[in-house]
Design a protein with these regions (language model features):
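Preference for the N-terminal adenyl/adenosyl cofactor-binding alpha/beta module
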Residues: 1-381, 392
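Cysteine-dependent PTP/DSP-like catalytic domain, specifically the C-terminal lobe
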Residues: 385-395
Length: 395
């Protein structure tokens, strides 16, 4: 959401010329791809799969962990607002993505070319300021103006997990360990992102404050229509949409928005005084974004909202607690002599490594591959066991 808002704001500042040929769906898919690239890099760096130690050039210039740490140090020393005036972090991220895709061969750094569609720079060339159909090896990049504050929030959205404190109170930020992250948990991250999509507002919307699972974006005209039905009906409607109590909603509706807060509303409304006048009676209901600005979505803006991609694509990642027993009981008769014959488990005999390697396992509806991942784990363990038994039999 932070990245899409930043890209849309940059597009607006350039008279909608930067993303003229990019649909909201493509914009959301590109943001989703950026987030999954970052997850991949965090995992690879924390597990030391990218050779940063023998090549300090990577750690100093390309590492997403380093970029995050440097930005946080600057924000703590000088305030996050300073980061809004700098744009180098986004260019460093794009360079890291290119390095993973195309590789780096130099005296001071060596990274093999991993390729793959996830990191392909030509998949979303507009992120680099290039036109569709151009190639990254020939066309000069002119990266979109994504400021360092946006990049910091992108990185920390993945690195920090908000944990509820027992007994109430504000949530505490806990750092995620990507070293210990299972592939299934990465699947859950992807699955959660598919719960949303991007749309272009055909009229003004407001993002309302609500409970954790209820922070809707609603057309301003619909809110005005509901408000015209009377206080009781309006409160009932807001309670259903936001999950907040009627007493809390009454307090929010009575809030007077003045001074700096009013100025920020005007900024969010693109200095449209007529729009601000319509928003003002409802301003207390509006939530703030990551930068402290009210979520006002003027006509023509792209915004993130609940989507149906996850449901329509059938993307529901199966947890390991289910894949482990299902894979075990499915494959045991294939890797052991005994289960199919009805022998007790104590009499089962593991087949030879040659027989195990000859097995072909297929999941016809593999989806995100949770069962195949677990099948690979299970077969790898049995194969190691078979090799060890063969070694013991023929020392």
């Amino acid at each position: 959401e932070v990245l899409i808002h930043s890209l849309d704001k940059a597009d607006q500042d350039f008279s909608r010329e930067l993303l003229a040929d990019v649909t909201p769906e493509q914009l959301y898919e590109s943001a989703l791809t950026v987030m999954m690239r970052l997850v991949f890099l965090f995992c690879a760096e924390e597990r030391e799969l990218i050779p940063s130690k023998p090549f300090p050039v990577y750690e100093q210039n390309y590492s997403v962990c380093t970029i995050s740490r440097q930005l946080r140090e600057l924000a703590d020393q000088h305030g996050e607002e300073l980061l809004e005036r700098r744009y180098d972090a986004w260019q460093r991220l794009l360079a890291a993505f290119r390095a993973v895709y195309g590789g780096l061969q130099h005296n001071d750094i060596h990274i093999p070319a991993y390729g793959g569609s996830l990191f392909n720079p030509d998949r979303f060339p507009f992120l680099e300021g290039r036109k569709a159909g151009t190639t990254w090896r020939l066309e000069k990049a002119s990266p979109l103006p994504v400021n360092n504050r946006t990049v910091l929030h992108l990185l920390e959205a993945l690195q920090l997990l908000q944990i509820k404190v027992p007994g109430g109170g504000p949530a505490e930020a806990r750092r995620v360990s990507f070293r210990a992250l299972d592939i299934e948990q990465i699947g859950h991250v992807y699955e959660g992102m598919l719960d949303h999509t991007a749309k272009r507002a055909t009229e003004p919307y407001l993002g309302l404050a609500g409970t954790r699972d209820k922070e809707p974006e609603i057309k301003l005209a619909d809110l005005e229509k509901q408000q015209s039905r009377g206080d009781a009906e309006f409160l009932k409607y807001l309670k259903e949409e936001t999950g907040k109590s009627e007493s809390a909603l009454k307090k929010l509706l009575k809030l007077e928005i003045e001074g700096l807060e009013a100025s920020r509303f005007r900024t969010a409304a693109n200095s449209d005084e007529s729009l601000w006048k319509r928003i003002r009676p409802l301003a207390g209901l509006v939530r703030l974004d990551n930068f402290g600005y009210p979520v006002v979505i003027p006509q023509g803006s792209v915004f993130v909202t609940s989507g149906t991609d996850r449901r329509s694509s059938g993307t529901h990642y199966t947890p390991r607690s289910l894949t482990e027993p299902i894979v075990q009981y499915t494959l045991e008769p294939l890797v052991y002599v005994g289960p199919a014959e009805g022998l007790p488990k104590s009499d089962w005999k593991l087949k030879s490594a040659k027989e195990l390697l000859a097995l072909k396992i297929c999941d016809m509806a593999c989806g995100s591959g949770a069962f195949l991942v677990q099948a690979t784990r299970y077969m790898a363990e049995r194969l190691l066991e078979a090799w060890e038994l063969a070694r013991q039999a023929n020392p």
